[in-house]
Protein backbone atom coordinates (compact mmCIF):
# COMPACT_ATOMS: atom_id res chain seq x y z
CA UNK A 1 0.00 0.00 0.00
CA UNK A 2 2.87 2.39 0.72
CA UNK A 3 4.30 1.80 -2.76
CA UNK A 4 0.90 2.44 -4.32
CA UNK A 5 0.52 5.65 -2.31
CA UNK A 6 3.95 6.88 -3.44
CA UNK A 7 3.17 5.96 -7.03
CA UNK A 8 -0.08 7.93 -6.88
CA UNK A 9 1.59 10.83 -5.09
CA UNK A 10 4.38 11.21 -7.66
CA UNK A 11 2.39 10.17 -10.70
CA UNK A 12 1.92 12.94 -13.18
CA UNK A 13 0.03 12.86 -16.42
CA UNK A 14 1.89 14.48 -19.25
CA UNK A 15 0.46 14.30 -22.72
CA UNK A 16 3.02 13.91 -25.49
CA UNK A 17 0.92 16.07 -27.82
CA UNK A 18 0.82 18.86 -25.24
CA UNK A 19 4.62 18.79 -25.08
CA UNK A 20 4.84 18.93 -28.88
CA UNK A 21 2.40 21.86 -28.90
CA UNK A 22 4.49 23.68 -26.31
CA UNK A 23 7.61 23.08 -28.40
CA UNK A 24 5.85 24.50 -31.46
CA UNK A 25 4.78 27.53 -29.42
CA UNK A 26 8.32 28.15 -28.14
CA UNK A 27 9.85 27.64 -31.61
CA UNK A 28 7.34 29.25 -34.00
CA UNK A 29 9.89 29.65 -36.82
CA UNK A 30 12.54 27.04 -36.05
CA UNK A 31 10.03 24.33 -35.16
CA UNK A 32 8.93 23.74 -38.73
CA UNK A 33 12.56 23.51 -39.92
CA UNK A 34 14.12 21.44 -37.14
CA UNK A 35 15.14 17.86 -37.69
CA UNK A 36 12.69 15.51 -35.93
CA UNK A 37 15.47 13.97 -33.85
CA UNK A 38 16.37 17.40 -32.47
CA UNK A 39 12.72 17.99 -31.57
CA UNK A 40 12.64 14.68 -29.71
CA UNK A 41 15.74 15.68 -27.75
CA UNK A 42 14.09 18.96 -26.76
CA UNK A 43 10.84 17.33 -25.65
CA UNK A 44 12.69 15.44 -22.91
CA UNK A 45 13.81 18.65 -21.23
CA UNK A 46 10.42 20.28 -21.72
CA UNK A 47 8.75 17.25 -20.14
CA UNK A 48 11.08 17.28 -17.14
CA UNK A 49 10.23 20.96 -16.55
CA UNK A 50 6.66 19.80 -15.83
CA UNK A 51 7.65 17.48 -12.98
CA UNK A 52 7.47 19.03 -9.53
CA UNK A 53 10.30 17.38 -7.65
CA UNK A 54 12.92 18.64 -5.23
CA UNK A 55 16.42 17.48 -6.23
CA UNK A 56 19.98 18.23 -5.18
CA UNK A 57 21.04 18.38 -8.83
CA UNK A 58 18.90 19.23 -11.87
CA UNK A 59 21.63 18.61 -14.47
CA UNK A 60 19.62 15.76 -15.98
CA UNK A 61 16.82 18.22 -16.79
CA UNK A 62 19.03 20.21 -19.16
CA UNK A 63 20.80 17.29 -20.82
CA UNK A 64 18.24 16.90 -23.64
CA UNK A 65 18.22 20.62 -24.41
CA UNK A 66 22.01 20.91 -24.54
CA UNK A 67 22.25 17.72 -26.60
CA UNK A 68 19.68 19.22 -28.97
CA UNK A 69 21.76 22.39 -29.25
CA UNK A 70 24.79 20.28 -30.15
CA UNK A 71 22.73 18.42 -32.76
CA UNK A 72 21.35 21.72 -34.09
CA UNK A 73 24.88 23.05 -34.62
CA UNK A 74 25.94 19.83 -36.35
CA UNK A 75 22.83 19.82 -38.53
CA UNK A 76 23.39 23.39 -39.76
CA UNK A 77 27.05 22.61 -40.41
CA UNK A 78 26.10 19.45 -42.31
CA UNK A 79 23.64 21.41 -44.46
CA UNK A 80 26.52 23.75 -45.29
CA UNK A 81 28.72 20.84 -46.34
CA UNK A 82 30.71 20.53 -43.11
CA UNK A 83 30.73 17.23 -41.30
CA UNK A 84 32.12 17.32 -37.77
CA UNK A 85 34.87 14.71 -37.81
CA UNK A 86 35.30 14.17 -34.08
CA UNK A 87 32.02 13.04 -32.51
CA UNK A 88 33.09 14.38 -29.10
CA UNK A 89 34.44 17.73 -30.17
CA UNK A 90 34.02 20.69 -32.48
CA UNK A 91 37.79 21.19 -32.63
CA UNK A 92 37.74 21.26 -36.46
CA UNK A 93 35.08 23.99 -36.49
CA UNK A 94 35.49 26.31 -33.49
CA UNK A 95 38.36 27.47 -31.32
CA UNK A 96 38.66 29.66 -28.28
CA UNK A 97 40.60 32.89 -28.70
CA UNK A 98 41.76 33.13 -25.10
CA UNK A 99 43.37 36.52 -25.65
CA UNK A 100 40.04 38.05 -26.68
CA UNK A 101 37.90 35.73 -24.57
CA UNK A 102 35.76 34.68 -27.53
CA UNK A 103 34.95 31.62 -29.57
CA UNK A 104 35.73 31.82 -33.27
CA UNK A 105 35.09 29.67 -36.29
CA UNK A 106 38.00 28.26 -38.25
CA UNK A 107 38.76 30.09 -41.49
CA UNK A 108 38.16 26.90 -43.48
CA UNK A 109 34.62 26.56 -42.07
CA UNK A 110 33.86 30.27 -42.52
CA UNK A 111 34.80 30.00 -46.19
CA UNK A 112 32.69 26.86 -46.61
CA UNK A 113 29.63 28.49 -44.97
CA UNK A 114 30.10 31.76 -46.84
CA UNK A 115 27.37 33.56 -44.86
CA UNK A 116 28.12 35.94 -42.00
CA UNK A 117 24.66 35.54 -40.40
CA UNK A 118 24.98 31.75 -40.33
CA UNK A 119 28.52 31.99 -38.99
CA UNK A 120 27.44 34.39 -36.22
CA UNK A 121 24.46 32.22 -35.27
CA UNK A 122 26.63 29.10 -35.08
CA UNK A 123 29.28 30.85 -32.98
CA UNK A 124 26.58 32.07 -30.57
CA UNK A 125 25.13 28.56 -30.32
CA UNK A 126 28.54 27.01 -29.75
CA UNK A 127 29.53 29.59 -27.14
CA UNK A 128 26.43 28.82 -25.07
CA UNK A 129 26.78 25.07 -25.61
CA UNK A 130 30.43 25.09 -24.61
CA UNK A 131 29.92 27.30 -21.56
CA UNK A 132 27.08 25.14 -20.25
CA UNK A 133 27.65 21.58 -21.31
CA UNK A 134 31.32 21.01 -20.59
CA UNK A 135 31.02 22.03 -16.96
CA UNK A 136 27.83 20.07 -16.42
CA UNK A 137 28.55 16.78 -18.11
CA UNK A 138 32.17 16.28 -17.18
CA UNK A 139 33.21 15.78 -13.58
CA UNK A 140 36.08 17.88 -12.29
CA UNK A 141 39.24 16.03 -11.19
CA UNK A 142 38.40 17.32 -7.72
CA UNK A 143 34.93 15.82 -7.68
CA UNK A 144 33.58 18.18 -5.03
CA UNK A 145 34.32 21.06 -7.45
CA UNK A 146 32.13 19.57 -10.19
CA UNK A 147 29.37 21.83 -11.36
CA UNK A 148 25.82 21.02 -10.28
CA UNK A 149 22.56 22.72 -11.11
CA UNK A 150 21.21 23.13 -7.62
CA UNK A 151 18.07 25.11 -8.38
CA UNK A 152 15.09 24.33 -10.50
CA UNK A 153 15.06 27.91 -11.79
CA UNK A 154 18.61 27.57 -13.15
CA UNK A 155 17.65 24.39 -15.02
CA UNK A 156 14.56 26.09 -16.44
CA UNK A 157 16.65 29.09 -17.48
CA UNK A 158 19.14 26.91 -19.37
CA UNK A 159 16.35 25.04 -21.17
CA UNK A 160 14.63 28.30 -22.09
CA UNK A 161 17.93 29.82 -23.24
CA UNK A 162 18.56 26.86 -25.55
CA UNK A 163 15.09 27.21 -27.05
CA UNK A 164 15.58 30.96 -27.50
CA UNK A 165 19.01 30.54 -29.10
CA UNK A 166 17.70 27.96 -31.58
CA UNK A 167 14.72 30.15 -32.48
CA UNK A 168 16.84 33.29 -32.80
CA UNK A 169 19.40 31.43 -34.92
CA UNK A 170 16.76 30.25 -37.36
CA UNK A 171 15.32 33.75 -37.63
CA UNK A 172 18.81 35.04 -38.49
CA UNK A 173 19.66 32.28 -40.94
CA UNK A 174 16.38 32.22 -42.89
Regions found by a protein language model. Name each.
Residues 5-8, 18-22, 26, 37, ...:
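Charge-rich, solvent-exposed alpha-helical interaction surfaces
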Residues 24, 28, 47-50, 82, ...:
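Generic surface-pattern signal
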Residues 39-43, 67, 71, 131-134:
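Generic structural signal for well-ordered, non-membrane alpha-helices
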Residues 76-123:
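Flexible secondary-structure boundary motifs
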Residues 115-174:
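Charge-enriched, short contiguous segments at helix-coil
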Amino acid sequence: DIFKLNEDLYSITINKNDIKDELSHKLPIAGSHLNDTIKKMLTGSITLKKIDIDLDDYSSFVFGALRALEAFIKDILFKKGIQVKNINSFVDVFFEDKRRGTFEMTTECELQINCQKTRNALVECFKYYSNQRHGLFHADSVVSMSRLIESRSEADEIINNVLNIIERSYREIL
